[in-house]
Amino acid sequence: MKISIVICTYNGAKFLGEQLDSIVSQSLSPYEVIAQDDGSSDGTWNILLEYAERYPYIKVYKNPKERGINNNFFSAIKRATGDLIAISDQDDIWESNKLEIMSKSIGDNLMCVGRSVPFYCKEDKNISIHYDSRKPNCNIIRMMYASMPGHCTLFRKELLTFLPKNLESCSIYTHTWYDVILGQTAAALNRIILIDKIVVKQRRYQGAASYSAYDKKRIRSANNALSMIGFGIRYYHKIKPLMAKHFAVRAGFLKTIPSEERIYKDAIKLMDYESKTSI
């Protein structure tokens, strides 16, 4: 089965070489690497050209103008011709057997999700990182509240056929990222599997698109739980309308997915309830 890797870049020259090295060193070689740049100005494009010259299966593309994360990734994904597609960020490091493990584990599912462990560079030693070692689940109800990062996923190209044809005009397209959309679709169809293996080292630094400072108050503990309950009660009338809108967007997207799974129907009922602005 052919595996395509899709990597989208934007001013990632500092760490891009390390990521590409981990890709070309995979124990199971990819059929192709689709690398699409979104208007970098720091030498990223030259690095892509250099690797494409050394490895003919790396195909490089440059957007004529900056398109943003979702437009960049979805247009790059459409270029992939493999049966399976793996998403790569520009600044992580893959475990050498990532493709081999995940391609063996996906089975008949539409998506396989692995785990990532955070790390930081020496110059970023003041950054706080936290690794949650608990094994999450990836059913559709959980995926309405949390998501799986794209760099940990391998999915069948078939998954794209379940997305609405007018995806770009759906509210969710401007409210969240591509990996949330893909993960929720696979989970709604109940064809997603999680493997409890670390497949990616995720680099954390302040320049990363997904970086946010880790808040120690969010570590699960009795004291923090009580603190969050108190916060929710105090600011309920401010928070509830925002959360209702948040869940209404997810409910609207969920209803476009052609699924008859019972858990999918339960998720829609839950999202409709969460979308109400009153208790």
Model-identified regions with their sequence ranges:
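Low-complexity, intrinsically disordered short peptide segments enriched in small/polar/basic residues
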Residues: 12, 20, 55, 103, ...
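Catalytic core of nucleotide-sugar-dependent glycosyltransferases
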Residues: 202-206, 211-264
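C-terminal functional modules
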Residues: 272-279
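Generic low-polarity alpha-helical segments
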Residues: 40, 225-228, 279
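Nucleotide-sugar donor-binding/catalytic module of glycosyltransferases
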Residues: 1-215
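Extended hydrophobic/aromatic-rich secondary-structure runs
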Residues: 150-156, 256-261, 279
